[in-house]
Amino acid sequence: MKTWNVYCSGEIHTNWRKLLSSMVKAEQLPIELTSPNCNHKESDAVGDILDPICEEPIPEPPFHYGENDKKYFFRGVKSAKINQTRIQSLIKECDFAIVTFGIGGELDFYRQWNVAFEAGCLYANNKPYIVVHPEKLIHPLKEIDSHALAWCQNYEQVISVMKSICLK
């Protein structure tokens, strides 16, 4: 039986990947889950290996850096390029993806631009994806939803769709 490679795109502030992984294991689905670097501080600082100019910690949101704007901007760009190398490789290798937009609390603050960008990368690479988000995001995510294999509101629905893809 084929083992399906499934890329998990989504916010890194909750444990949704662990939940999905435990559900995949419980259902004994032939799926290997992959994801970007989910350690927020490590992901933000990975560019420091190129030029450790920012040894002080990154400020907490809302990210008003003042006179350090340029320093943190270029730190972010360097880190993003390294992170994108991993992300693009995993996207190219995946059979399909789960694209999750979280809900509530601080997740509304982050707006999850990275997730939208990764959905665009999946589309550009002709990779099918299942999108997961609450009903209140239907309108803002209509372009992303229009290219999805399925729209799910919870991970039980995701598992049902994955069963149909991977076991039939």
Residue spans for each PLM region:
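Conserved catalytic or regulatory cores that recognize and/or transform ribose-phosphate-containing ligands
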Residues: M1-K168
